[in-house]
Amino acid sequence: MASAKIKKGDSVVVLSGKDKGKTGTVAKVMPKEGKVVVEGVNMIARHRKPSQENPQGGIDRYEAPMHIAKVAVADPKDGKPTRVRIEEKDGKKVRVAVKSGETIDG
C-alpha cells in the first residue's frame, strides 16, 4: 500500500459514511491495515457483561478504526478537505495542502 500522507495529530474531514462532514484529530494510524482512528468519529457501543473488575457492567463507547480512504486532511486555511503533496523546502520534505499551498507541518 502506498504512503497515506496522514499522520497522528492531523486534523481530518470524513468524506463518506454516517459521519460524513465531521472533523476530528487522528488518534492512531494503522498503515498495514489501511485504517485510522479519529477522535469523536465512528463511535461504537460495546455492551459489557458484569465481571469482577466491572460489577455494574454497562455500555462502553469508543472510536472504531475507519478506512483511510474515507478521510482527507483538512486544509489549514479553510478547514475543507484537501489532498496532500510532498515538497522539499530548505532541504527538508514537508507536506503541503494542494488546495491552498499552505504547509501542513514543518
Curated annotation (Swiss-Prot):
Gene3D superfamilies: 2.30.30.30
Pfam families (alphabetical): KOW, ribosomal_L24
Subunit annotation: Part of the 50S ribosomal subunit.
Domain of life: Bacteria
Name of the protein in its database record: Large ribosomal subunit protein uL24
Entries under InterPro entries matching the protein: KOW, Rib_uL2_dom2, Ribosomal_uL24, Ribosomal_uL24_CS, Ribosomal_uL24_KOW, Translation_prot_SH3-like_sf
Gene for this chain: rplX
Stored NCBIfam families: rplX_bact
Organism field: Erythrobacter litoralis (strain HTCC2594)
PANTHER family: MITOCHONDRIAL RIBOSOMAL PROTEIN L24
UniProt keywords, alphabetically: Ribonucleoprotein, Ribosomal protein, RNA-binding, rRNA-binding
Molecular functions (GO terms): rRNA binding; structural constituent of ribosome
One GO cellular component term noted in the UniProt record for this chain: ribonucleoprotein complex
HAMAP family: Ribosomal_uL24_B (MF_01326_B)
GO BP, one annotated term: translation
Function per UniProt: One of two assembly initiator proteins, it binds directly to the 5'-end of the 23S rRNA, where it nucleates assembly of the 50S subunit. One of the proteins that surrounds the polypeptide exit tunnel on the outside of the subunit.
Family that this chain belongs to: Belongs to the universal ribosomal protein uL24 family.
